[in-house]
């Protein structure tokens, strides 16, 4: 599993564009959590994919309108998301 955190503007369609970056590549999203973070929103997404696919998805997200940044989740954040996904 790989976890990413994506910071984006709270504008119409922004979350849809973020999630579409994963679904266009045929990735199954295991878990997603989204909430406000200051004047932006932050999504934590957990997917099971090969490293090259994650790299391509990160590049696409970084060029997506409204996305400010993409970073990997640390292991404890990934474990928390996975635990919540299995409940």
What are these regions (language model features)?
Residues 1-87:
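A conserved regulatory-domain signal marking ACT and ACT-like small-molecule sensing domains
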């Amino acid at each position: 599993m790989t976890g990413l955190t994506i910071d984006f503007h709270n504008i119409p369609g922004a979350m849809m564009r973020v999630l579409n970056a994963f679904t266009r590549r045929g990735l199954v999203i295991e878990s997603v959590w989204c909430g406000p973070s200051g004047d932006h929103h932050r999504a934590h997404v957990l997917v099971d994919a090969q490293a090259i696919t994650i790299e391509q998805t990160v590049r696409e997200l970084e060029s997506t309108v409204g996305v400010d940044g993409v970073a990997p989740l640390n292991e404890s954040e990934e474990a928390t998301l996975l635990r919540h996904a299995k409940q």
